[in-house]
């Protein structure tokens, strides 16, 4: 029976253990507060150090800028002094004799004259070349074609660049949406992880509280068993003592009664002590449970506030994103409209210029055709006039021959001799005319060869100009003075 009884100071030891546990919790809380204070102090110190470093860097850059400015000023001052010294030396060395100055002036005048003549020749060549380029219809046609081809190529290049730019913008938007989706998934995963960790923490706290409640209940059950065992032992002792003292004398019975009264008083006091300890334990358990419940409620309120704040931030973020996308869409549409309008205006202007050029070219060709028709009519008139002259000469020759024959039949030998002489003169004239016709034919052949040679030179010049020059960016209308 004595072996199963708990030591008298068991409850005191348990109270001391509980007090030590509470003291340890308070010490841990103080250590945690101290660590938080140290972390805040380190953060403030780091911020101050960074600010000092930035200020030092700013001061160093400012000092270096001032040093560079002073160095540049010194270099400029040295350069000015050197130029001043060189100018003084040049002024001192420029003192020459009148003969030297006259010779230098003459040499300079000859050099300027040669330079001016070279510039005049170059300007004349340039102006001749420019006049040839502007007055050559073949070059104008080729340049018009080259400008048209270049315009088409540039327009195609701009269209391709615009399409590539739109494709790149679409790809950037797609990548941006993908990145936004990835970030959103990461945020949701972090939120779920935080929720899981909070749930695990709450479960751990509940498990610890359940373990503490179980231990408290076990301690209560053990204390109750000890009390019941002690009461049963005391009752058994009392009954044994009462049974042993029944046969004693009255004094012993009185003593036993006094002892029983003292024992009852002891039991009452003991019972009061046990009730006070139970009440303290229950109040402590209730206090611990209330603190745990209040902490859990505070955590849930903080979590709800955090979720509401994150939801508000996501809503504002989506609204800002929608506004940015709408603004970008409006700017893109407006820019495309301006580009299309400018392109249409440019095409209309180019079409008007091409129509004006075609009209000017058509008028020029009409004028050239009219001039050629006039020249052809003049040549035909000259040929008809020459044919009439030849016919008149042949008729005159026939008349003269008939007259000579009639005169030859009527006249004597002297007249025949004169007729023969005139015939010889006529033959000489005919031979001379034949020679003149041959010379005219040779002259026409020479003119044709010269014309062909000039045309070949003209074609070579055109080809050389086309290969050595670029088409003009703007080819305006010329005024022709025929």
Swiss-Prot record:
Subcellular location, record wording: Cell projection, Cilium, Flagellum
Ranges where the record places region Disordered: 462-482
Function as written in the Swiss-Prot or TrEMBL entry: May play a role in filopodium movement.
Principal subcellular localisation of the protein: other
InterPro entries named among the record's database cross-references: CFAP53/TCHP, TPH_dom
Ranges in coiled-coil conformation: 9-40, 67-124, 152-413
GO cellular component, one term: motile cilium
Name of protein: Cilia- and flagella-associated protein 53
Record key words, sorted: Cell projection, Cilium, Coiled coil, Flagellum
Organismal lineage: Eukaryota, Viridiplantae, Chlorophyta, core chlorophytes, Chlorophyceae
Keyword Coiled coil listed: yes
Family that this chain belongs to: Belongs to the CFAP53 family.
Organism: Chlamydomonas reinhardtii
Record GO biological process: cilium movement
Domain of life (superkingdom): Eukaryota
